[in-house]
A protein has these predicted regions:
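C-terminal cap/substrate-recognition subdomain and adjoining C-terminal extension
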Residues: 1-173
Length: 173
């Protein structure tokens, strides 16, 4: 569902989609997305994957155990590193609204940074960390988020159970 929705918007030039990851390599993510798109008969719509890459020995597929950042950039290791990457992407974007979808604790800074931060899935660890920081009030169900004014929405994280809910939420925009 999300792939079809995104493909339509990318084709109409109303959406650019990126992935920023601390845990997975760019090659792994790109290959998984390509296989998924082929399996579902849709175009791969992610504009670019920003993730660390495993360093291999020259002329070999053998990994050295080191990682390097995307392109010539610093490695992405923490939530603040993800925010720096998102800020760099947004500064070059033709779009004026940033939406960030995440599910882990390293996503918290980006969920709070984005114009629209969407916590997908149960997000138990994210919820626990926000609770420990006394920030429970930033989390909203989709229904309660809809009742907020624009400034309050931008200072909030909206919780979506799955990609269907994310798709429905984004169609409101």
């Amino acid at each position: 569902v999300m792939q079809y929705w995104m493909a339509q918007r990318v084709a109409c030039d109303t959406l650019a989609a990126y992935i920023v990851s601390v845990n997975w390599s760019r090659t792994f993510i790109s290959d998984a997305l390509k296989a998924c798109a082929e399996q579902n008969g849709v175009e791969q719509v992610i504009s670019y994957v920003y993730a660390n890459e495993l360093v291999t020995k020259p002329g070999s597929d053998e990994c050295t155990g080191l990682i390097q950042g995307p392109g010539q950039r610093e490695r992405i290791l923490t939530g603040p590193d993800k925010v720096k990457m998102c800020e760099a992407i947004a500064s070059k974007s033709a779009y004026d609204t940033s939406v960030y979808v995440g599910d882990s604790t390293t996503d918290i800074p980006c969920l709070l940074w984005a114009d629209m931060g969407i916590l997908i899935g149960s997000g138990d660890q994210v919820r626990d960390m926000l609770h420990q920081a006394g920030m429970d009030s930033v989390l909203h169900t989709i229904d309660s988020w809809k009742q907020l004014d624009v400034m309050q929405q931008r200072a909030s994280i909206v919780c979506a159970s799955d990609w269907y809910a994310v798709c429905d939420l984004l169609q409101l925009q």
